[in-house]
Design a protein with these regions (language model features):
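Membrane-water interface of alpha-helical transmembrane segments
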Residues: 5, 9-12, 43, 88-92, ...
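Alpha-helical membrane-embedding segments
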Residues: 82-83, 104-117, 163-169, 185-195
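Juxtamembrane/interfacial segments around transmembrane helices
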Residues: 99-109, 153-162, 176-187
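Short helix-coil transition/hinge motifs at the ends and kinks of transmembrane helices
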Residues: 36-41, 110-124, 143-151, 177-183
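Hydrophobic alpha-helical transmembrane segments in multi-pass integral membrane proteins
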Residues: 166-178
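Multi-pass membrane catalytic core of lipid/isoprenoid biosynthesis enzymes
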Residues: 69, 73-130
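Membrane-embedded alpha-helical segments that form the functional core of polytopic membrane enzymes
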Residues: 23-67, 102, 107, 123-138, ...
């Protein structure tokens, strides 16, 4: 019971359900691109990509709640941060730790690619996609002068969220070195439009 009380607020902060669901997007992208279950180094890299996406989303979701804490004190006082179940200091550590984990899984995937038959060049699109997602995160959440502040700008913010959701399947295809696969891009477009219509 005590363990549940400790973990439940973190699961809520990280939106663990949505974040874990993203794993299926990565797996789907890799299966569509390779026309079957990936094997060998590709299978290992796909798993690492899944973990990278999951922890990236943990970080983004936690950052979103951290940035909205004052609003949530009024509108959603039951959430982990405004309720005090998780302190702001602990939340910052969680955001940083999960971001580092996401990058670490990516680095391990790069090492496996470089050390094996795939080669680093075949894996580099994965890094580009991860960086695009990071740029979207910065421009969505940050209030910096360098940011487009898309979160509060309506349509651009919706585009950023829909793009980040769609990128998951492209990231999966990149895990098997085929990020330009036509089947994957068809699913990406459908997913992007569906999510955009919901936003």
């Amino acid at each position: 019971m005590r363990t549940y009380r400790t973990l439940a607020p973190w699961a809520a902060l990280f939106r663990s359900g949505n974040s874990v669901t993203a794993i299926f997007g990565v797996v789907l992208g890799s299966i569509l691109a390779s026309q079957g279950l990936p094997s060998g180094d590709f299978a290992i890299i796909t798993v690492l990509h899944c973990l990278s996406v999951m922890t990236f989303m943990f970080s983004w979701n936690a950052l979103n709640d951290y940035m909205d804490i004052e609003i949530d004190r009024i509108n959603r006082p039951d959430r982990p941060l405004p309720s005090g179940e998780i302190s702001e200091v602990a939340a910052r550590r969680g955001i940083l730790s999960t971001a580092i984990l996401s990058a670490s899984f990516l680095i391990v995937a790069a090492y496996i690619s470089h050390s094996g038959e795939i080669g680093l060049e075949g894996w580099l699109p994965s890094l580009a996609i991860w960086m695009i997602a990071l740029v979207l995160l910065f421009n969505y959440e940050s209030s910096s002068k360098l940011s487009f502040r898309m979160k509060d700008s309506g349509l651009p913010g919706n585009l950023a969220i829909s793009m980040s959701v769609g990128l998951v399947i492209i990231f999966g295809a990149a895990s098997v070195s085929d990020p330009l696969n036509q089947r994957v891009w068809s699913v990406f477009i459908v997913g992007f439009l569906y999510n955009f219509s919901r936003e």
